[in-house]
Amino acid sequence: MAMKRAKVVFTCGISLLALCAVAAVFGTTNTIGQQGKVARVDWMSKLPDSTEISQLNIPGTHDTLALYGLADFSGQCQSLDVKQQLRIGVRFLDVRLKQIGNKLRAVHGFVDQKESFDFVVKELESFLKENPKETLFISVKEDDKAESPAFSFEECLNTYLKDEFWYTSDTMPQTLGQVRGKMVLLTRYDDGNKGVNMADKWQDCGSFSLDDFYIQDEYIIDDIEAKKAAILACSEKDSTYRLNFFSGYFRKGFPPSNAPSVAKIINPWAIKALPQMNKRGVCLFDFITSELMDAYFGGQA
């Protein structure tokens, strides 16, 4: 969640901890990745190079690196580290960072995640070296602003973007063959000049169109049934690409930032609902599990 939105909620009297709460493959028909036997660690290797990115179903995680919370109830969104997530099939990573000097560090709002981006990138590069036919989609967001930085956020990010591993065009790749063994960069920070820019038109807490994308990110939840309806509605949209966030927090919950509160309801529901969703797009989950991945891939082993 953006630092701006965190400040707004905080000034409204809701603890910033609430914003650290626990809290789709792209396309219109999206049948690829649902049928047949798929080995999760290299499931993309079974697909032809000609596979259109817009026809893929891609499982992802919201706040991918948020393994730690404040006082054990705020900030954590995942229980599996990035290496474990990749091995069970996750391919869209929602990365939240803070600039410290000329380096980047994983955060969720103001909650430090005890991980440097240097280490994370090495893990991602290592995975792609071992699985060169896979592709990762990396959304990078500046989740906490640095105080009077000597370098811009993107200048720091550029030091991590090796051409060997990164696809940094401002348009989405057309086919899987274009980006095998690479990370496709999507950006959610101000004044970005690399990657697919999502920041300029991103709306806070809603369902909206953004260029070729349709995005459902209704993260403030008063009615869990309304959240389910928003997820299902997103899955039926005819946009070229879809990002469908299954994550969120209860505005009126107590404590308001209780990390597993939404996931405890949404994830079991998703396990039943996902096999019926033909057009999944990119689905981003809190507390991803192998059971969720089984449902996402239609019960494949």
What is each stretch, according to the model?
Residues M1-S15:
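N-terminal Sec-pathway targeting helices
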Residues C12-A24:
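Hydrophobic membrane-insertion alpha-helices, especially the h-region
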Residues A23-I88, F92, G101-E130, T135, ...:
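Long, acidic (Asp/Glu-rich), low-complexity accessory segments flanking structured domains
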Residues R96, I138, L185, C283:
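Conserved, mostly hydrophobic/aromatic
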Residues L97-I100, K141-D143, D190, I288:
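An acidic- and aromatic-residue-enriched active-site/binding cleft used to recognize and process polar
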Residues Q99, P132-E147:
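Active-site groove signature of glycoside hydrolases
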Residues S148-Y160:
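Short, electropositive alpha-helical surface patch
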Residues E164-P275:
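Surface-exposed substrate-engagement region within the catalytic domains
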